[in-house]
């Protein structure tokens, strides 16, 4: 007796087997597809791991930007009066109103002071007036870092040309080395200053302060455009500086770690708010 009694039974069985084969084929394809997906996921995971490792290493490379402010000649004797500044009335730059009265500020030796106060109270206006007096003095070497960097930066020059005051190749090489330590690329060193970010401009001015060997620094929001990774380095540099610092800041860490005295700007003048021991 034949295995299959009729053609219809044979067709039905063949159809079932064909469906089973197609199902197995589809499962095999899906399995290969899943393996490919898993492989892609694992590859992506490894790539993210490598990126994470690189990111965790960033603070170490950022810490390496350290360089000193001033030199052995920047130290100011403890008893030397850096400034004894008096002003009856502080006017707005346009002369339309009085911001404060009876201002008095005395700084001696290596004192580092910070002026705080509300926006519009006249802090920057006062600091500019103080800088005008100190920058003219011959018995000290003062440098000023304004809140608006463009007041000092020559925007069409490259960072190297702006910082180069001698034209000697040796000095230009040193400037490039310092800029490299501040994470400037060779290309960025040749860009006009106007194309730089706020943080890059701040680094140029910080390097200018260092190269100048000044012993009095006048700083308006000195930590404002530096990254959180650079902040501790900048604060340490200013803390170790052997000269005097007159500054404005809203940065609590800077005030606590760097400044010896904190003055509040009021309509009645400068009020000593606290002395850090």
Regions found by a protein language model. Name each.
Residues 1-96, 108:
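Coupling and communication elements adjacent to P-loop NTPase active sites across diverse families
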């Amino acid at each position: 007796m034949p295995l299959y009694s009729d053609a219809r039974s044979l067709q039905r069985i063949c159809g079932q087997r064909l469906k089973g084969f197609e199902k197995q084929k589809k499962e095999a394809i899906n399995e290969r597809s899943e393996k490919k997906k898993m492989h892609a996921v694992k590859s992506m995971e490894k790539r993210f791991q490598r990126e994470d490792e690189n990111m965790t290493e960033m603070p170490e490379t950022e810490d390496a930007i350290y360089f000193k402010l001033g030199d052995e000649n920047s130290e100011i004797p403890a008893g030397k009066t850096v400034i004894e500044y008096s002003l009856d009335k502080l006017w707005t730059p346009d002369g339309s109103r009085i911001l404060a009265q009876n201002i008095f500020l005395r700084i001696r030796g290596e004192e580092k002071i910070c002026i705080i106060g509300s926006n519009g109270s006249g802090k920057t206006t006062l600091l500019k007036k103080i800088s005008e007096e100190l920058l003219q003095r011959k018995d000290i070497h003062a440098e000023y870092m304004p809140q608006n960097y463009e007041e000092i930066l020559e925007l069409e020059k490259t960072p190297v040309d702006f910082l180069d005051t001698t034209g000697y190749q040796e000095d230009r090489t040193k400037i490039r080395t310092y800029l490299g330590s501040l994470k400037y690329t060779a290309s960025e060193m040749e860009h006009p200053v106007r194309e730089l970010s706020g943080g890059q401009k701040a680094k140029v001015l910080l390097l200018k302060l260092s190269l100048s060997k000044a012993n009095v620094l006048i700083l308006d929001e000195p930590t404002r455009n530096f990254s959180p990774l650079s902040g501790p380095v900048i604060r340490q540099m200013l803390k170790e500086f052997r000269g005097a610092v007159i500054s404005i800041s809203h940065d609590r860490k800077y005030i606590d770690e760097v400044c010896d005295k904190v003055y509040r700007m009021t309509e009645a003048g400068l009020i000593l708010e606290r002395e850090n021991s």
